[in-house]
Regions:
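Beta-alpha-beta core module
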Residues: 73-80, 85, 144-194
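Flexible hinge/capping segments at coil-to-helix
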Residues: 5-6, 76-114
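Hydrophobic hinge/microswitch elements
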Residues: 47-51, 56-59, 66, 115, ...
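A late-sequence structural motif
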Residues: 24, 173-216
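Alpha-helical "hinge/linker" immediately C-terminal to small N-terminal DNA-binding modules
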Residues: 1-9
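Short, well-ordered beta-strand segments
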Residues: 11-15, 63, 110, 156, ...
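Central regulatory/effector-binding core of bacterial HTH transcription factors
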Residues: 9-71
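Secondary-structure junction motif
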Residues: 107-129, 195-197, 203, 213-214
Length: 216
């Protein structure tokens, strides 16, 4: 096992699932960086499957992903749930006429890609609610989804946490929350990385405040 304490400049390669909120991932990674330690953080973005393959090949030190792994099926890999948050539907004015969630049938929707865990959960939720929605597009980037939604008068999806300040303006309105559909955040790492200081800090940090949304 590597003694990372002896390294003068710690390299920390992190893969980030492209479907996750970059704002929340950035806050998670804050724990990896401390002033009195020389750390070189490198972040890479891709799909969960591609990142998991790179982690297995020792090309990454950790993955921040939207789904866990089964340690019994992935020998030598561990996953830890960092947190989860509900998602909201947003749009620009004027607001839909019907109440939520029936209003989701009034406009075309922008959702996370169906290859992401959240995208699949939302599609199942639409079916469970008996909603006949029209999907205009699938986006993994929240900022791009917001910009495209404003241009095309569409309803789009983002973490409810964004109500705190990210979407706290008059042009974007939260029309409804789905608390039982959660966007999950998991840290996945190899056994050889357990002693890495950055891995230890991320795994030992309490992120409960980060994943607590503001009240409506």
């Amino acid at each position: 096992m590597v003694n990372y304490r002896k390294e003068s400049n710690l390299l920390f390669d992190v893969g980030v699932a492209d479907a996750l909120s970059k704002r929340l991932v950035s806050s998670v990674l804050d724990a990896a960086v401390v002033e009195d330690e020389q750390i070189h953080l490198r972040c890479f973005e891709s799909t969960h499957e591609m990142l998991l393959e790179q982690l297995s090949q020792h090309k990454l030190d950790m993955i921040i992903s939207d789904c866990p792994i089964d340690s019994t099926q992935q020998e030598g890999l561990f996953s830890m749930k960092i947190g989860e948050c509900g998602v909201s539907f947003w749009c620009t004015n004027p607001l839909p006429e019907k109440p939520f969630p029936a209003c989701l049938e009034e406009r075309r929707l922008l959702i996370p890609g169906r290859r992401s865990m959240l995208g699949r959960k939302l599609l199942n939720w639409f079916n469970s609610q008996g909603l006949n929605v029209e999907i205009l597009g699938e986006f993994d980037d929240a900022a791009l989804m917001k910009a495209f939604g404003a241009t095309h008068n569409a309803i789009f999806v983002a973490p409810s946490l964004y109500a705190n300040d990210f979407y706290n303006d008059d042009s974007v309105v939260e029309i409804g929350r789905v608390e039982n559909v959660m966007e999950e955040y998991h840290a996945i790492f190899a056994e050889r990385m357990i002693q890495h200081p950055a891995v230890q800090r991320i795994c030992n940090t309490d992120y409960s405040a980060l994943f607590t949304p503001a009240s409506k």
